[in-house]
């Protein structure tokens, strides 16, 4: 039985579903997804404080980001990653972003589920939040693990394009990309929103036109918006109504004129599209 999306574009290339990704992924067809990008909860919401935009703010993102039980976090990651593997095509790949709070558990779970880790990308942010406590080095990066489903089945990688985007030099595993720009938040924002430049580079490097991309933690829909700009097909899963509505607004924002404007801005971030 086909599950009805919360929102489906007229061309059926942009679909978002409301619900828990673990529940929903079991309803999708196995071996049908070309690439998965996932930005799972980092579980950072511990009532601490941070310094952002010259204002002291709470680090709390929402109830979905609260969990201080290591066993529970491990089981959560194991369950959704195992289901994600079922959905990937045999030559498919998965990208998972995180910080030191969750990325080591994610890497371990990937290996336990027989993924082959290809790279660990360091996303360096040129303008990180100030070091509020002054008790350790300033956090200025996040990591993104890239892995493929099978150790011996080749994956797709657009090496030539990545080299072209890097001034005809091999693209390294340290990416210096800016955080989300104000032009990406005109319809609203998500507390852990990723920049379109980051997702565009990921999509361009590991997928081809008309490929099917899944984001099980869709948030504000950045993966899907980047997919629309780059002529890919998208499935997103998100629990929170406010972010589903935000994703819809962002999708409807992309008129032909604005699509070209967005691509020009992304081009400045990653050199060329």
From Swiss-Prot:
Claim: S-adenosyl-L-methionine is one of the keywords in the record: yes
The chemistry this enzyme catalyses reads: a 2'-deoxyadenosine in DNA + S-adenosyl-L-methionine = an N(6)-methyl-2'-deoxyadenosine in DNA + S-adenosyl-L-homocysteine + H(+)
> Pfam families under this entry?
N6_N4_Mtase
Return the SUPFAM superfamilies for the record. S-adenosyl-L-methionine-dependent methyltransferases (SSF53335)
Q: Which InterPro entries match?
A: DNA_methylase_N4/N6, DNA_methylase_N6_adenine_CS, RM_Methyltransferase, SAM-dependent_MTases_sf
Cellular component GO terms held in the UniProt record = cytoplasm
GO: which molecular function terms? DNA binding; N-methyltransferase activity; site-specific DNA-methyltransferase (adenine-specific) activity
Residue spans making up a coiled coil are: none
Q: Looking at the keywords, is Iron present?
A: no
Sorted keywords for this record are: DNA-binding, Methyltransferase, Restriction system, S-adenosyl-L-methionine, Transferase
Q: Where is the signal peptide?
A: none
Give the GO biological process terms: DNA restriction-modification system; methylation
So what EC number does this one have? Answer: 2.1.1.72
Other facts noted in the record for this chain: The MboI restriction system has two different methylases.
Instruction: Describe the family membership recorded for this protein in Swiss-Prot or TrEMBL.
Output: Belongs to the N(4)/N(6)-methyltransferase family.
Q: What does this protein do?
A: This seems to be a weaker methylase than M1.MboI.
Xref: PANTHER family:
RNA METHYLASE-RELATED (PTHR13370), TRNA (GUANINE(10)-N2)-METHYLTRANSFERASE HOMOLOG (PTHR13370:SF3)
Protein's UniProt name: Type II methyltransferase M2.MboI
**Protein species of origin:** Moraxella bovis
Q: Which gene encodes it?
A: mboIBM
